[in-house]
């Protein structure tokens, strides 16, 4: 059963176990992801040499498509295959997948190769993977006329994974059930890398929690709560960013002392 205590327990387990999380980052947010993982108690390694991949004692893999090139997509695929061989959870963030036809085709090929355990993305990116939108401008394009709960469920069923869809409304789905989370702050859309940070936190929790649905929900809920508290101590997006990193290290305590706001239901049959 989903409760504040079950989510807080995930974060306590993370800090106790301090798992090594392998992140193949994009060129924009690598430093943010490393610092976020350190803040919550994980141990990040941002290895990009394929010869190392099979040798790393990592317990999860996080892949970011944010700055794709042909060589970089091959690198992501190699990291994914190494994680598959070790039976590790793989979290994929198909950043800006709707921006160009090339990027979308590259993302689809990567998904087919690595078969991610979890996809973390926004609504516009999800629609691109479902072929329900054309080329998008930017990575945070919204589509208000689509129900994110239905989109998340469709995506989860199509690719056989858990989907963490973040934005104005956060939804997590395994294709059968969906959980809508109601935490966060508008300033998250005004700083670079918020979504990428959530992706890395999902990877950290999936490293210590076998229930990947719970790990994804816990990461998104905890990050949203941290953002809410950070906003109380900030004057604007710049100071909010600093305050957010301060709060990441206290997520378990925030959840213990906060009201978890969520809805959970089963998807209707198609």
Swiss-Prot record:
SUPFAM superfamilies recorded: Ribokinase-like
CDD domains referenced in this protein's UniProt entry, alphabetically: THZ_kinase
Binding site for ATP: 120, 166
Catalytic activity: 5-(2-hydroxyethyl)-4-methylthiazole + ATP = 4-methyl-5-(2-phosphooxyethyl)-thiazole + ADP + H(+)
Cysteine-cysteine disulfides: none
Superkingdom of source: Bacteria
EC number: 2.7.1.50
Pfam families: HK
Function: Catalyzes the phosphorylation of the hydroxyl group of 4-methyl-5-beta-hydroxyethylthiazole (THZ).
Family: Belongs to the Thz kinase family.
The protein's name in its UniProt record: Hydroxyethylthiazole kinase
Organism of origin: Herpetosiphon aurantiacus (strain ATCC 23779 / DSM 785 / 114-95)
């Amino acid at each position: 059963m989903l409760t504040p205590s079950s989510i807080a327990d995930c974060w306590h387990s993370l800090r106790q176990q301090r798992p090594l999380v392998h992140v193949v980052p994009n060129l924009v947010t690598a430093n943010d992801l490393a610092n976020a993982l350190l803040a919550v108690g994980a141990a990040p390694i941002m290895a990009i040499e394929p010869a190392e991949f099979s040798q790393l004692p990592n317990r999860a893999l996080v892949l970011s498509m944010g700055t794709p090139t042909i060589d970089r997509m091959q690198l992501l695929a190699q990291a994914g295959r190494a994680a598959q061989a070790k039976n590790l959870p793989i979290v994929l963030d198909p950043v800006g997948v709707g921006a160009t036809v090339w990027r979308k085709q590259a993302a689809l090929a990567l998904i087919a190769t690595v078969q991610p355990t979890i996809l973390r993305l926004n609504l516009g990116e999800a629609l691109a993977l479902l072929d329900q939108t054309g080329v998008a401008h930017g990575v945070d394009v919204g589509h208000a006329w689509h129900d994110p709960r239905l989109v998340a469920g469709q995506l989860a069923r199509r690719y056989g994974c858990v989907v963490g869809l973040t934005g104005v409304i956060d939804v997590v789905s395994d294709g059968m059930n969906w959980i809508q989370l109601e935490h966060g702050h508008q300033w998250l859309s005004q700083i670079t890398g918020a979504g990428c940070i959530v992706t890395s936190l999902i990877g950290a929790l999936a490293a210590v929690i076998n229930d990947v649905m719970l790990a994804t929900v816990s990461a998104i809920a905890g990050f949203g709560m941290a953002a809410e508290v950070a906003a109380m101590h900030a004057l604007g997006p710049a100071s909010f960013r600093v305050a957010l990193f301060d709060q990441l290290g206290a997520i378990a305590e925030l959840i213990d002392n906060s009201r978890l706001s969520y809805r959970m239901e089963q998807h209707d049959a198609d």
